[in-house]
Amino acid sequence: MASVQLRNVTKAWGDVVVSKDINLDIHDGEFVVFVGPSGCGKSTLLRMIAGLETITSGDLFIGETRMNDIPPAERGVGMVFQSYALYPHLSVAENMSFGLKLAGAKKEVMNQRVNQVAEVLQLAHLLERKPKALSGGQRQRVAIGRTLVAEPRVFLLDEPLSNLDAALRVQMRIEISRLHKRLGRTMIYVTHDQVEAMTLADKIVVLDAGRVAQVGKPLELYHYPADRFVAGFIGSPKMNFLPVKVTATAIEQVQVELPNRQQIWLPVESRGVQVGANMSLGIRPEHLLPSDIADVTLEGEVQVVEQLGHETQIHIQIPAIRQNLVYRQNDVVLVEEGATFAIGLPPERCHLFREDGSACRRLHQEPGV
């Protein structure tokens, strides 16, 4: 196992900068997830750690060794790709031991490692099968096993679940989490799926247009996003945003005016906030309240009702706001499309963002953070 450090790492192709001044500390045995939209540079960052992409400037360390000029095969990393890339004419055991065979490992060593990893991944009964006889989840486990038998110090996974159906993704997500707990290896995982990031990670790195937007534990990013981008990316359905204007400030409070002219005091850091400033109020769909238990409410027309059984998601068009708000309740809510529906805003669950997108620090203490 080993730690990974990136110091001012930049990657550019000509004038196009895809990763800019990346600084990260990944601790020994940590499970870190790089998450962000397509094109944010997360896979490029992983490939630089693997040695598959050169670093334009900055330094990469694995353990105590600077790795910028070290070939991929000598870095002690193992990588699992979105594609299984299994040899169809080889058995599961032969696929898993292929890298060791090329490296000149003895047959006894190969057999021992393959059998050990097969037990961990529940593949022992499948070692003689060919890939065509395996399910998608089994093939992905073989690809993971092929990397594990090489005993890498750092384990890299580039969107390994993207080719699987929804049910299989959930199953494999659980298996990868169990695998990390059992092995204690340093793992770096790339995904665009924020649910995977929230459920797997010890620490999440949110990337936006080649920069690190925020690094933190899953609940920290959920409850205390550093900016509007992170707030909108982490959480599903995503956070609602309302245009507001600052009408007053006090110590550790900011008063804003909502689109319906109601005013609400928010428990957020007020330093640097100017009266009259245009800002954005954010609130998650699951934090909105029924209007009868809230002091500050918004009313609008129901556009869409999504009944999911265990919860209801209601899309509401609020006058003077171009986009819908989404209200989420963990129950069945019987309401017709076109009906008038009111929702409440609890001040302690609201977020406030400046015009540049940065967040005013929330002062309400959330559990588990």
From Swiss-Prot:
Record's keyword annotation contains Cell inner membrane: yes
A Pfam family per the record: ABC_tran
CDD domains according to UniProt: ABC_MalK_N (cd03301)
GO molecular function, one term: ATP binding
TM region positions: none
Resulting phenotype, E306K: Loss of transport. No effect on ATP-binding and ATP hydrolysis. Retains repressor activity
GO cellular component term, pick one: ATP-binding cassette (ABC) transporter complex, substrate-binding subunit-containing
EC number: 7.5.2.1
ABC transporter domain span: 4-234
Location of the protein in the cell: Cell inner membrane
Family label: Belongs to the ABC transporter superfamily. Maltooligosaccharide importer (TC 3.A.1.1.1) family.
Function description: Part of the ABC transporter complex MalEFGK involved in maltose/maltodextrin import. Responsible for energy coupling to the transport system.
Matches recorded under NCBIfam families: PRK11000.1, PRK11650.1
Complex formation: The complex is composed of two ATP-binding proteins (MalK), two transmembrane proteins (MalG and MalK) and a solute-binding protein (MalE).
Misc: Target for inducer exclusion, mediated by the unphosphorylated enzyme III of the phosphotransferase system for glucose and resulting in the inhibition of maltose transport. Acts as a repressor of mal genes. In absence of maltose, the C-terminus of MalK interacts with MalT, then MalT becomes inactive and the mal genes are not activated. In presence of maltose, MalK is tightly associated with the MalFG complex and has no affinity for MalT.
Protein name in the entry: Maltose/maltodextrin import ATP-binding protein MalK
Gene name of this polypeptide: malK
